[in-house]
Structures are given as C-alpha cells and as structure tokens.
Curated annotation (Swiss-Prot):
Residues on Lumenal side: 77-97
Subcellular location: Endoplasmic reticulum membrane; Golgi apparatus, Golgi stack membrane; Cell membrane; Membrane
Gene label: psenen
Subunit and partners: The functional gamma-secretase complex is composed of at least four polypeptides: a presenilin homodimer, nicastrin, aph1 and psenen.
Biological source species: Dictyostelium discoideum (Social amoeba)
Full protein name: Probable gamma-secretase subunit PEN-2
Length: 97
C-alpha cells in the first residue's frame, strides 16, 4: 500500500478517490487515468462495482487517448518535412537543419 491508511479505506473513500482521479483525467492528463488504475490494483479483489466502473473507463480513456496521441506523433514525425512551413508552424520548437 502507498500509505498506512490505505489498508483502512472503506468503499466510500475508494469511490471518492476513483471519481476524483477519473475527472482529473479529462483535463488532457491521461496519465492520471493510468495512476487511477495502478493505485487500485492491490484492491482488485474487494472493489465496489462503482469503483470498477471508474477504473474500466479510466483504462478505456487512457488507451484511447494514448492511441490517438501516438498515432498523431507517428504521422507528424514522418510527414513534418513534407508539410513544409505548415509542419514548422505547428511545431512547439523548430529544429535547425
């Protein structure tokens, strides 16, 4: 467990933590959804159905967002030079060369 109090989490506290992490993940922070899933792994045998719902959709959100992001990164890295000025315009940093 992460902290000694974790052994004493009741269902209401678990639901509250899972819900907060799930909502925080919507602010373009999909890694928070992953943390939500990893945090509750030790409790997986005793989870409430509501917590399982948040964890299931955290996993779906994390995988979906990561797939879209990695797909975009692949397309961008392969085609940036072909796009010319547009490829440079959408860059955060413009590489030299």
């Amino acid at each position: 467990m992460l902290i000694p109090e974790d052994d004493k989490l009741d269902d209401e506290k678990m639901i509250n933590i899972a819900k907060k992490l799930w909502f925080i993940g919507f602010f373009f922070l999909p890694w928070v959804w992953l943390i939500n899933i990893l945090y509750f792994i030790p409790y997986r045998n005793s989870l409430n159905d509501k917590v399982k719902w948040y964890l299931k959709f955290s996993l779906i959100g994390f995988l979906g967002y990561s797939t879209i992001f990695m797909g975009w990164m692949g397309i961008y890295l392969v085609n940036r030079n072909k796009w010319g000025a547009f490829g440079d315009d959408i860059s955060i940093t413009i590489p030299f060369g």
